[in-house]
A protein has these predicted regions:
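GST-like domain detector, emphasizing the conserved glutathione-binding G-site
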Residues: 1-114, 121, 128
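GST superfamily/GST-like fold recognition
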Residues: 87-92, 130-143
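Short amphipathic alpha-helical segments
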Residues: 111-115, 119, 136, 140-141
Length: 143
């Protein structure tokens, strides 16, 4: 998103293997000890959670979050945050990180992932982007 809106930024590595995300300094900006998180030094704010970051940057920049279509954009962004992302994440967990550990998990999340991709293909066969003809934060978050 930062690339899309043309904002300058600096990446700060958080070493998850060493547990950097659990240090008190990091928990001040990300209370659940998760990435991503951004710090807007201009406005002296930290923002955590992918969807919240996308909304914040879209509102700040005035890009990819059309006021006339926000309900539709929000629907698709929330679908990504609450369904698409978590389900594809589970598929990845069972098929790539822990193959052979749970036949039930592998089959379940393979079927769900396949259905998600079919549903997204169906939506995108009818419109250029998820929420219509404009590229939005819903598309950025989902793809």
């Amino acid at each position: 998103m930062l690339e899309e809106i043309g904002y300058k930024y600096r990446v700060v590595k958080v070493d998850l293997d060493k547990g950097d995300q659990f240090k008190s300094e990091f928990k001040k900006i990300s209370p659940f000890s998760k990435i991503p998180v951004i710090i807007d030094h201009e406005n002296k704010k930290s923002i955590f959670e992918s969807g919240a970051i996308l909304i914040y940057l879209a509102e700040k920049s005035g890009k990819f979050y059309n006021e006339n279509n926000r309900t539709e954009i929000n629907q698709w962004l929330m679908a990504q945050m609450g369904y698409v992302g978590p389900m594809l994440g589970q598929h990845h967990q069972f098929h790539h990180y822990n193959p052979g550990k749970s036949k039930f998990g592998e089959e379940r999340y393979f079927k769900i992932s396949k259905r998600i991709y079919q549903e997204l293909d169906e939506v995108l066969s009818k419109s250029k982007f998820l929420s219509g003809n404009d590229y939005t934060i819903a598309d950025i978050g989902t793809f």
